[in-house]
Swiss-Prot record:
Residues 335-344 have a biased composition (Polar residues). Residues 134-179, 304-385 are annotated as: Disordered. The gene is spt20. Keywords: Cytoplasm, Nucleus, Transcription, Transcription regulation. One of its GO terms (biological process) is regulation of transcription by RNA polymerase II. Component of the 1.8 MDa SAGA (Spt-Ada-Gcn5 acetyltransferase) complex, which is composed of 19 subunits tra1, spt7, taf5, ngg1/ada3, sgf73, spt20, spt8, taf12, taf6, hfi1/ada1, ubp8, gcn5, ada2, spt3, sgf29, taf10, taf9, sgf11 and sus1. It comes from Schizosaccharomyces pombe (strain 972 / ATCC 24843). This is SAGA complex subunit Spt20.
Amino acid sequence: MERNNGLGDYTYRYHGKELSLDDFQNKQGIESSDDAFLSKIYENVSNFNVPRKLHDIEHKFSKEEPSLILHIHKFHFRFEQQDGAFTYNGPVKSILQYIRMELIPPDCLEVFRNSDVKFYDGCLTVRIIDHRQSPSADQTVQPQPGSTNQQQQNNTNPINNQPEDTKPNTNSPPVYHTVLRPTPETLWQDLCLLSESFANSLSDEAVLTLESNILLASEAPLFLTPAKSKAEMIQFMNQLADSAPPCTRKKPQGSAQLADEEAERLEKENLLLLMDDQRKRDFQPTFQRLQFIENVRRKRAILQQRQMQMQQQQKAQQQQSPKAQQPPAHLVQSAPVQRKTTPKIQRLPPSSIQIPPPKPMQKFPANAASSESPPNATGNFLPSGPVPANEPMLKRESVDLIKIRQLAILFQQRASQLKARGATREQITEILNRQAIAAGTDLATVMTVARNLHFQQLQMRQQQQQQQMKAER
């Protein structure tokens, strides 16, 4: 309400319309749709314009569909036409806190906009259906936290002792209604979303003009007349003041929760003061960057040293592998030592001794040569003869392959045991390499055979599974 040029007429603003005191006194030219609003304002002309209350908005749009329908269950809550549900300890629990304070959650404005949620005079009407109480409970139901404040404000509502839409049928759950009002944070979020929809092409003047129009359409009329007495000022303040939010009993928080809240508060504060040029920033020189560079160089030097050690170990293995592949000394047949002898003069035997003529060399079949047995560990040949049918012959290559397979299985078990004890990969490799050298082979050959055995086992399992599937079919 403003006084114009010291005259006796006042100017009121309601829903963006500027009206003078003469318009209230001369109601003949006013349309029927505006009569209710003007008469409501005219009743308070002697005092001042009372701002809109939430129960007034609820009563005005009681016949309209609610903006949101919330179903509250014992262990979860969900909105109407929602596939899943939210838990009370989940990340969406802040919505219930905003509903309890009767405020629009600013983080959900984009979701409301994409879902085409209806706004009534910039507010959201919420219908809350409580499914937590059993059907056998009494009809006198404890009110919902979000609607207790509403019932305290609505002194003219004749239904105060039981929730709205409550019927004598005990099977129907109690229903409550509340209104979520906008805040400066939601207004700022609306302007940001609108600017993004125009690809940030709006100027500052256009945004300020838009903000002023929104405030004219949604906020209550202003009262700018100074009070004449202290009692009148107290009356003005009581009528303009909003009721306090409902008191809640907070559970005692632990040190971890308090630390998280403090960190979140500091993060928000730093975000708000990010572009503040007058903010004093203490200059504290540190050497964190130099320490980081030193740590990187040290790690690189350690990696290079490890690579050098690995290369040296591989070279040592390659040098020892030819020696390790040679058979042991006790298995090698000692070759006859050739002595240098001077050539002797061949003497013919006397004529009295008759020398028999040389016999031609007999040819034996091919399988006869295979019947000869190789020398045993002592260097002597085994007795020749036919080999029994129940004792198959094994070649040296097959014997070595069986030995390497056994070593591969033993190495796998040994590696798993060392790994369970906490040995590093380098230690396991060094231990297995020593054992392979002691067994007369190298670690690379054993690991290759181990991989082949692993692949063969996998193939056998796949074949067995395929056979089982075919048998089931």
